[in-house]
């Protein structure tokens, strides 16, 4: 596909434990002739949460994989985080973003809401009272707090999402995507806030040398 006329870039979604050195070297070669973005599913920086959701790789491995990718500055990285994971507080969700953007040389971020789907283990946890779903107000507040600490040079690719209605147990308010987006904008305006207004500047090795 990359040799087809008109193809100017490639975007790959994967896991930190699925990128051996030879794959990264191949992506580095591609990045010399087209735009290359690698999207990494991090979801959380907390190991206890990782164990609960069976992520099966550590935050340490994620950090190391980002470093290996960014040895090649033309490879851009987009990280995925999920708000509302089991046991995570508002403060932990904000900390997930803080760690993600200060520990790692990333160029983009996608922020998701936990969608509870049918035929999952979390469905049982929810019905047995071990999982609480976020309200729209809670989600809007945490997203705005996260946006404030994300440096302005990092591209926000997503701040909410949706799921198939026939498979979604909750939160049902997430189906009204534009309502959620409008609520986030309204809250940012109420605060007089913008992306990165509380961000801490972080300098990475490849930025010092380019």
PLM features: residue spans?
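Acidic (Asp/Glu)-rich catalytic clusters
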Residues: 1-5, 25-35, 67-72
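Conserved N-terminal glycine/acidic-rich loop preference
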Residues: 6-9, 13-15, 60, 69-75, ...
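Auxiliary Fe-S-binding modules of radical SAM enzymes
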Residues: 101, 107-108, 115-210
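Catalytic cores of alpha/beta
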Residues: 23-27, 86-103, 166
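Conserved strand-turn element in the central/C-terminal portion of the radical SAM core barrel
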Residues: 45-47, 69-92, 112-118, 125-133, ...
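Core AdoMet radical
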Residues: 4-19, 34-62, 110
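Hydrophobic/aromatic residues located in beta-strands of well-ordered beta-sheets
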Residues: 10, 38, 77-79, 156
């Amino acid at each position: 596909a990359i040799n087809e006329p008109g193809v100017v870039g490639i975007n790959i979604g994967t896991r930190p434990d699925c990128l051996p050195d030879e794959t990264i070297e191949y992506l580095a070669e591609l990045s010399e002739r087209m735009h290359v973005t690698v999207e990494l599913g991090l979801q959380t920086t907390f190991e206890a949460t990782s164990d609960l959701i069976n992520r099966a790789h550590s935050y340490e491995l994620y950090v190391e994989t980002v470093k290996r990718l960014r040895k090649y500055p033309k490879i851009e990285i987009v990280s995925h985080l999920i708000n509302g994971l089991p046991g995570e507080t508002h403060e932990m969700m904000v900390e997930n973003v803080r760690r993600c953007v200060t520990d790692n040389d990333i160029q983009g971020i996608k922020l998701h809401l936990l969608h509870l789907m049918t035929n999952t283990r979390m469905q049982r946890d929810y019905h047995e009272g071990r999982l609480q779903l976020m309200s729209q107000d809670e989600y809007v507040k945490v997203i705005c707090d996260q946006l404030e600490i994300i440096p302005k040079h990092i591209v926000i690719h997503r701040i909410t999402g949706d799921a198939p209605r026939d498979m979604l147990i909750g939160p049902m308010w997430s189906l009204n995507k534009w309502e959620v987006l409008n609520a986030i904008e309204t809250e940012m305006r109420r605060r007089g806030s913008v992306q990165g207004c509380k961000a801490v500047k972080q300098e990475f090795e490849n930025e010092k040398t380019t």
